[in-house]
């Protein structure tokens, strides 16, 4: 039964059904009754396992195929008509050739299965920020996960009306054949196709595929920005809430910052933090010339291992009801879940992420390192009152960060917008090669968008520079590094809630309330301007954390030039002059 008369939608659904040949088609209306019926059906096939209703009400466990447990960058393509529009950081294939290849794989891929039609919205339905999509899938796990991660159902179809302005998404698990696994974006056709995967990041098409890869291209064409950023509201003791966005590569503490709990000395004074978003921000220029942000998602798709009462109590609290856990440990004694880093008490009677009997003493991991929770944002104790706002929140600061042992100081402010774009473009994290003890590879991840930018990274930087010209009141741009180490390799900064001490200085800079010292890199705090009360950090350590090693930075400049070289004439001239200016300052 079609839920819409929109021919742009019904015709496409019919075409895709003729290709995939499902046994039946079910339109998702967004009602709890229909979702409950689907969850019940998935329990019958083992696709979902119901967990302890008393301890984890409305929660389920899902296990993906062992060969299908993460995003696959090597199988992810941007198929723009011209290869140069995809750029050197994306995989590209000619769209015609790719469609042909994909249609061959989709042909009959849903035989004997049901095709579900999911109308979904990124952003609050009916808001200026909202963009709509339809995902076709043969997976109930995808349906119930999309119902958490996005706003779904009949209201979305009503908002689309008879327009052709929506993103088409086709997903089929097919055979789960890793050799024929593709996650493909056709930016000019507003189309996403994902096949032979059942894993979240590849199949919840609203997330990275739409909200970043396709949306970044839409933003370029429509004068807005889709960014891989958290959105955090910081409420000071006067009751004023100020907002920051933050871009961090994976394993750099993004979720912890998004759900930050102020240190005790701050809590006592009345500081509070509010989560607007933990992963994606859509940013538009407001009538006041400021940048306004919304979180287009409706849930959190978080990494489970390491999430604990100590590391991130807010994230853990968000998973206590109506959550889907993927590839974690199942405790057979009380039918709950566990993962490494949750606590020190792994269950004795349990199944690992593959569903095999697990012995917690044999050294094997019970949960997959990339195991996940899909939880409604509304469950989070610190979810912002502005979460459902149609206009979003005004952004005072953009914070970039990476994981560097020695180069980047704890915090510095860029000199201006273009310099800030430069700071974001050189973002990097380094891996430690444990065997040799040497600091290993520096992985550049500009604006944390390397895997998610839907077009040429050089054009993306140009778009940032162009946006700066259109903002009469732009946010100030900062870089942080929570991961500086001493000569023994120990972290010098406590991180977690104590990061608020740095964010306080950042916001003070945005509102002209605190001074700074100019260095070769930009503006840094005076040691006395960071509140260390109760942090356990001495002023000497802080001074060390703020030091700029000119020799290291001159080496860094070489690495940046090598990185920039691959973009050829797509590198904005503003960034070329920023690297020249930085080298000049360092040589003085």
Which residues fall in each region the model found?
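Hydrophobic positions on the alpha1 helix immediately C-terminal to the Walker A/P-loop
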Residues: 257
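Conserved internal helical-beta-strand scaffold that buttresses enzyme catalytic cores
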Residues: 2-252, 262-588
């Amino acid at each position: 039964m079609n839920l819409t008369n929109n021919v742009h939608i019904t015709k496409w659904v019919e075409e895709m059904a003729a290709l995939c040949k499902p046994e039946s088609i079910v339109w998702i209306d967004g009602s709890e009754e229909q979702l409950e019926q689907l969850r019940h059906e998935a329990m019958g096939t083992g696709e979902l396992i119901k967990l302890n209703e008393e301890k984890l009400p409305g929660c389920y466990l899902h296990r993906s195929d062992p060969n299908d447990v993460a995003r696959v960058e090597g199988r992810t393509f941007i198929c723009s008509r011209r290869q140069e529009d995809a750029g050197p950081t994306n995989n590209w294939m000619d769209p015609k050739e790719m469609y042909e290849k994909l249609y061959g794989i989709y042909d009959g891929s849903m035989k004997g299965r049901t095709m579900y039609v999911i109308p979904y919205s990124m952003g609050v339905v009916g808001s200026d920020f909202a963009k709509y999509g339809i995902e076709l899938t043969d997976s109930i796990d995808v349906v119930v996960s999309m119902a958490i991660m996005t706003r779904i159902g009949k209201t979305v179809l009503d908002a689309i009306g008879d327009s052709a302005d929506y993103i088409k998404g086709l997903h089929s698990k097919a055979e789960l054949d890793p050799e024929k696994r593709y996650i493909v974006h056709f930016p000019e056709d507003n189309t996403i196709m994902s096949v032979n995967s059942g894993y979240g990041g590849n199949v919840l098409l609203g997330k990275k595929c739409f909200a970043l890869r396709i949306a970044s291209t839409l933003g370029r064409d429509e004068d807005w920005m889709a960014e891989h950023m958290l959105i955090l509201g910081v409420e000071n003791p006067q009751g004023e809430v100020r907002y920051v966005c933050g871009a961090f590569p994976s394993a750099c503490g993004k979720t912890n910052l998004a759900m930050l709990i102020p240190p005790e000395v701050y809590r006592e004074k009345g500081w509070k933090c509010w989560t607007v978003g933990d992963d994606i921000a859509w940013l538009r220029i407001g009538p006041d010339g400021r940048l306004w942000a919304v979180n287009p998602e409706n849930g959190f798709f978080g990494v489970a291992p390491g999430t604990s009462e100590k590391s991130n109590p807010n994230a853990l609290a968000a998973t206590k009801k109506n959550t889907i856990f993927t590839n974690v440990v199942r405790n057979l004694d009380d039918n709950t879940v566990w993962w490494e880093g949750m606590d020190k008490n792994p269950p004795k009677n349990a199944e690992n992420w593959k569903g095999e009997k697990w012995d917690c003493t044999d050294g094997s991991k019970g949960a997959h390192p990339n195991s996940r929770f899909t939880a409604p944002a509304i469950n989070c104790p610190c979810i912002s009152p502005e979460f459902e706002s149609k206009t979003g929140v005004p952004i005072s600061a953009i914070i970039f960060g990476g994981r560097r042992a020695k180069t980047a100081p704890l915090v510095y402010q860029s000199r201006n917008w273009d310099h800030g774009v430069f700071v974001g473009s050189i973002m990097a994290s380094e891996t430690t090669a444990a065997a040799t003890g040497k600091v290993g590879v520096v992985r550049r991840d500009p604006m944390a968008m390397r895997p998610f930018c839907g077009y040429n990274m050089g054009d993306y930087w140009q778009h940032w520079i162009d946006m700066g010209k259109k903002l009469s009141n732009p946010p100030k741009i900062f870089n942080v590094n929570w991961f500086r180490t001493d000569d023994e390799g120990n972290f010098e900064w406590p991180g977690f809630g104590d990061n608020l001490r740095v964010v306080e200085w950042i916001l003070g800079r945005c509102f002209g309330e605190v001074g700074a010292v100019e260095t070769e890199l930009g503006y840094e705090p005076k040691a006395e301007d960071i509140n260390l009360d109760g942090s356990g950090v001495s002023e000497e350590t802080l001074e060390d954390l703020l030091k700029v090693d000119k020799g290291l930075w001159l080496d860094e400049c070489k690495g940046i030039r090598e990185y920039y070289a691959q973009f050829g004439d797509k590198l904005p001239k503003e960034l070329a002059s920023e690297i020249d200016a930085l080298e000049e300052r360092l040589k003085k």
